[in-house]
Amino acid sequence: MAGGGAPAPKADEPQPHPPKDQLPNISYCITSPPPWPEAILLGFQHYLVMLGTTVLIPTALVPQMGGGYEEKAKVIQTILFVAGINTLLQTLFGTRLPAVVGASYTFVPTTISIILSGRFSDTSNPIDRFERIMRATQGALIVASTLQMILGFSGLWRNVVRFLSPISAVPLVGLVGFGLYEFGFPGVAKCIEIGLPELLILVFVSQYLPHVIKSGKNVFDRFAVIFAVVIVWIYAHLLTVGGAYNGAAPTTQTSCRTDRAGIIGAAPWIRVPWPFQWGAPSFDAGEAFAMMMASFVALVESTGAFVAVSRYASATMLPPSILSRGIGWQGVAILISGLFGTGAGSSVSVENAGLLALTRVGSRRVVQIAAGFMIFFSILGKFGAVFASIPAPIIAALYCLFFAYVGAGGLSFLQFCNLNSFRTKFILGFSVFLGLSIPQYFNEYTAIKGYGPVHTGARWFNDMVNVPFSSEPFVAGSVAFFLDNTLHKKDSSIRKDRGKHWWDKFRSFKGDTRSEEFYSLPFNLNKYFPSV
């Protein structure tokens, strides 16, 4: 060609898929609710999905505290009640995303550390011991909540996340989902004859059946969780009443049986949880510092979860001020958890973020309806306990799909990055590898020795180091964030490689008109609490 120019591309030459600020093909976004009957069913699905964590955390903690079935049932009710309140607060005044805020596994190691501390060994009565430990956990959570409230409401976290780019969001959001792999198939395998059918039916109903039976109403993919859970729950109940587990080992019976008479029998018919129901909180400086570090880890993880939720709700990237506001209200959620005595702090539910992807419904109203179900079934204890008795392998099968969706949501931000850049490859590969490898070392060491790699005489200091390095998204996100903001950042071509130019318009609340549509406060509160 004359002049040495490159030939014009042919019309049929393959072109890359164009990057999208908002995820296309979503049926209902934040501000477009589905019809009421459909919204109520979808809200009930969200309630079913968040039950897994709600039951697993008290199951792990309450027996170690000294509590029995009655205390466990009360803690489950309390977690449900608090989750309903916190979800409403987050959807109304926080980020306003359809994010469920429930109990978090991140706080469990610190709570276990409080349980194992020697200061409760002099209490012989197990119920008294349970209440003393719960009051100590309450005190630690109340103090720890101040960290997120200060960072969020002061705008300090806003200044941090302004440096977040698509390349550093990939490891953070990706491992928020993929980092929870231990709760997936290992949980399914605890009762493979129930867990595996649930996983297969869920995939078939949600992915294959809509293409076989084209109803045009998205019934199967939208309500796949209800279909799959009901079918396998009935099947599991038939196995239970048929005597399939009568001679099985106790662990098998716990995982497989549907007649958990203990939790259903112990749950009261009607009970409204109230603040300080276990007594006045007690405070210990070391435990408060350890819980504060767990709160900071939950803050980082929830930042990634909020980004994933915004993607699957077909919203634009959150402006830093909105993300900071959401973190502030998550601090309020931890405070409420401490006041009511849930045994663990609160963070964004990753499994419910994955459910948004499965249903393709990112409506705020649906999640608010789910919050109503949480509060309703927490007060009517017997009915809530029936749903809480769903075998854990069924819930673990749901996790296999939902955590995968959230991880894939993190990978989707690669569309904004230059994948032909060696800088990009190094940051992505190194951060993801360390995000998997470092927590593996810490968790493996703890499983073998019974304590973490950092093992000094100060238990609170051990927790402050061991907890963050046991979190995959915290390690991966921190490494990626540091490298992305220190490695040849001033080079002009690097900015495009990072994908930062795609998010420039979302640096401030008024930088894009869509931000007001998705994230503005209700009741004209933006006039009094303006976002920047």
UniProtKB/Swiss-Prot annotation:
InterPro entries: NCS2. The gene is NAT6. The lineage of its organism: Eukaryota, Viridiplantae, Streptophyta, Embryophyta, Tracheophyta. Keywords: Membrane, Transmembrane, Transmembrane helix, Transport. The keyword Transmembrane applies. It holds the Pfam family Xan_ur_permease. This is Nucleobase-ascorbate transporter 6. It is found in: Membrane. It comes from Arabidopsis thaliana (Mouse-ear cress). Residues 10-20 have a biased composition (Basic and acidic residues). Expressed in the apical region of cotyledons 4 days after imbibition (DAI). Expressed in the whole vasculature at 12 DAI. Expressed in the root central cylinder and lateral root primordia. Expressed in the vasculature of sepals, filaments, carpels and developing siliques. The chain crosses the membrane at residues 39-59, 75-95, 97-117, 137-157, 163-185, 192-212, 223-243, 289-309, 361-381, 392-414, 426-446, 463-483. Belongs to the nucleobase:cation symporter-2 (NCS2) (TC 2.A.40) family. It comes from the Eukaryota. It is a multi-pass membrane protein. GO terms for molecular function: transmembrane transporter activity. The keyword Nuclease does not apply. One of its GO terms (cellular component) is membrane. Disulfide bonds: none annotated. Residues 1-24 are annotated as: Disordered.
